[in-house]
Amino acid sequence: MVMIMRICIQPVGDVNDEILKFLKKKFGEVFGMCEILPKIDIPIYAYNFSRGQFNSTLILKSLPTVEDIVLGVTEVDIYADNLNFVFGEAELFGKRALISLARLRPEFYGLPPNKDVLKIRALKEAIHEIGHVLGLIHCENKRCVMSFSNSIIDVDLKDWRYCKKCLKKLQDRGIYISI
């Protein structure tokens, strides 16, 4: 049984259209329905000049609140309080999540651009953050998509799917997804 839920992808600033379309396709397969909303501007007040990064919590709070889950996708480098950077942030049991593509890009680490690598990394972090919205916390299974990623190596090591334990937690809440 698959629960049909709608995920709205919210571009925050200019975001690579190919990545947005890839996420839309995969979310449709996993969650049931997905749409891409019109782009919104990056809130300038979220920029921290001394760090040269944007505060993820401020961007997250700027996302629209709708009945559906909203996943913000941005190209800017983000951080959260007490952390040098984050790949994303979400409201636990909320409606909003955010990912940044900045540190998911191979070129951030001095490597050649690779769209396929970027797509799978974006998918992993997006499904991870949506997991938080659905009530999942970090998983100890390093292969589970809900594993905490402290570096890009951690992102690359984990799968894009929830482990059996995390799937069971979702099912216990009446959430059935196709993954």
From Swiss-Prot:
Pfam families assigned to the protein according to its UniProt record, in alphabetical order: Peptidase_M54
Entry-linked Gene3D superfamilies: Collagenase (Catalytic Domain)
Any one GO BP annotation for this protein: proteolysis
Disulfide bonds: none
Keyword hit for Lipid metabolism: no
Chain positions recorded as Zn(2+) 2 binding sites: 139, 144, 163, 166
Residue numbers binding Zn(2+) 1: 128, 132, 138
Cofactor(s) the record lists: Zn(2+)
Molecular function terms from GO: metallopeptidase activity; zinc ion binding
Cofactor note: Binds 2 Zn(2+) ions per subunit. One is catalytic, whereas the other seems to have a structural role.
Protein's UniProt keywords contain Metal-binding: yes
Enzyme class: hydrolase
Subunit-level organization: Monomer.
Function: Probable zinc metalloprotease whose natural substrate is unknown.
Family of the protein in this entry: Belongs to the peptidase M54 family.
Name used for this protein in its record: Archaemetzincin
Organism (species): Methanocaldococcus jannaschii (strain ATCC 43067 / DSM 2661 / JAL-1 / JCM 10045 / NBRC 100440) (Methanococcus jannaschii)
